[in-house]
Amino acid sequence: MSKLSVVILAAGKGTRMYSDLPKVLHKVAGKPMVKHVIDTAKQLSAEQIHLIYGHGADLLKERLADEPVNWVFQAEQLGTGHAMQQAAPFFKDDENIVMLYGDAPLITKETLERLVAAKPENGIALLTVELENPTGYGRIIRENGSVVAIVEQKDATPEQLKITEVNTGVMVSDGASFKKWLARLDNDNAQGEYYMTDVIGLANQDGFKVAAVTADDMMEVEGANNRLQLAALERYFQRKQATALLLAGVSLADPERFDLRGELEHGKDVEIDVNVIIEGKVKLGNGVKIGAGCVLKNAIIGDNTEIKPYSVLEDSSVGEQAAIGPFSRLRPGAELAAETHVGNFVEIKKAVVGKGTKVNHLTYVGDAEIGSGCNIGAGVITCNYDGANKFKTLIGDNVFVGSDVQLVAPVKVNNGATIGAGSTITKDVAAGELVTTRVPQRHTADWERPSKKK
């Protein structure tokens, strides 16, 4: 049986989060917990992903609008068995159905593949975990390797309480069997709910074999019911990613102070200082150095470039042998060529900057093209917006723009031109020209400053 579908339980409110956000939308590594689970289901090549939703329905659908899921509404949350009953009409008899939880984001493809492989031809397979302190969890009771029961803490004998293997709730069986067992579930218990743990008893009654696979790491199956548990998942996940990067040759100044909230592709001899955040898809070339406190989102950085402390780069690219920062901001559409220098308190947006050009201090460059070998002085502003529309500034090669210059777009400064400090440029500048628009300097001898009136 090669066909497989996944059911993700995501209808809970998450009262202990004390939040208006549905629990499964709280994030780990910058991504909603349920999105992690959906991505894992995709890795399994699931034919269908049934998402059981309830609380925060509109918000959940909005945030996951692009996901290929079958939305299954659970009006009342009456237990895990009740949630599965809502999805049962969509099950195909001859496919495996894997049940997952939207608030347990760290489950891996490899563990689930082991679980599916362990499922008997006629039977069910559970994912279990070994805990040093299993207090409060349902114990796995085995006979001859097969699971015969899950005994809750309050019902366990002293001997059963010594068992450290516990139920995670993750399981797999074929669609036909699940539909049969789900139809027989009842809510004859103190909570008046339908539980998937009762399916194990039904399977044994029917003579089906119940297999179990133990997760290698308990954190894979940990859920988050409150923000403390959410923070623990975040730290574990970040530590795991940092470990992988260190083993791949990336130098992290302090693995405990590094956050990867997306995908990082890197070359050799990359150095990352403390409190750096990586978001989206980021590519770092060989010998790249990232300073403390930087944030990189969807950025490409060329070989041997240094991003100095507290710089923010988003949807932008920087060529090789460049220097950015400290305290620089590259906004979407910034494309910097090799050997460029961008200094402190410079903001660049939707602009191309040519090879070797320097923009060193206190400058805004937006909607512009700047050639190679230019010097853009301190306090230069490309005035690109008239309150309604954006206009472009074009600067050729080897242009020198002095300090405190305003370039009022649309305007073009051609190759080799020089703009004197303090000028406001409203007309095109020809190649090789020197342009100044300063008011002539006046001198008044023997000037006396006004004195305060008594």
UniProtKB/Swiss-Prot annotation:
Subcellular localization(s) per the UniProt record: Cytoplasm
Associated pathway: Nucleotide-sugar biosynthesis; UDP-N-acetyl-alpha-D-glucosamine biosynthesis; N-acetyl-alpha-D-glucosamine 1-phosphate from alpha-D-glucosamine 6-phosphate (route II): step 2/2; Nucleotide-sugar biosynthesis; UDP-N-acetyl-alpha-D-glucosamine biosynthesis; UDP-N-acetyl-alpha-D-glucosamine from N-acetyl-alpha-D-glucosamine 1-phosphate: step 1/1; Bacterial outer membrane biogenesis; LPS lipid A biosynthesis
Record family assignment: In the N-terminal section; belongs to the N-acetylglucosamine-1-phosphate uridyltransferase family. In the C-terminal section; belongs to the transferase hexapeptide repeat family.
Region (N-acetyltransferase): 249-454
GO biological-process terms attached to the record: cell morphogenesis; cell wall organization; lipid A biosynthetic process; peptidoglycan biosynthetic process; regulation of cell shape; UDP-N-acetylglucosamine biosynthetic process
Catalytic residues of the enzyme: 361
Catalytic activity: alpha-D-glucosamine 1-phosphate + acetyl-CoA = N-acetyl-alpha-D-glucosamine 1-phosphate + CoA + H(+); N-acetyl-alpha-D-glucosamine 1-phosphate + UTP + H(+) = UDP-N-acetyl-alpha-D-glucosamine + diphosphate
Keywords, sorted A to Z: Acyltransferase, Cell shape, Cell wall biogenesis/degradation, Cytoplasm, Magnesium, Metal-binding, Multifunctional enzyme, Nucleotidyltransferase, Peptidoglycan synthesis, Repeat, Transferase
Binding site for acetyl-CoA: 378, 384-385, 403, 421, 438
GO CC terms: cytoplasm; membrane
Disulphide-bonded residues: none
Binding-site residues for Mg(2+), renumbered to this chain: 103, 225
Species of origin: Actinobacillus succinogenes (strain ATCC 55618 / DSM 22257 / CCUG 43843 / 130Z)
Class of the enzyme per the UniProt entry, highest EC level: transferase
UniProt protein name: Bifunctional protein GlmU
MF-aspect GO terms: glucosamine-1-phosphate N-acetyltransferase activity; magnesium ion binding; UDP-N-acetylglucosamine diphosphorylase activity
Binding positions for UDP-N-acetyl-alpha-D-glucosamine per the UniProt entry: 9-12, 23, 74, 79-80, 101-103, 138, 152, 167, 225, 331, 349, 364, 375
Cofactor binding mode and count: Binds 1 Mg(2+) ion per subunit.
Superkingdom of origin: Bacteria
PROSITE patterns membership: HEXAPEP_TRANSFERASES
Linker: annotated segments: 228-248
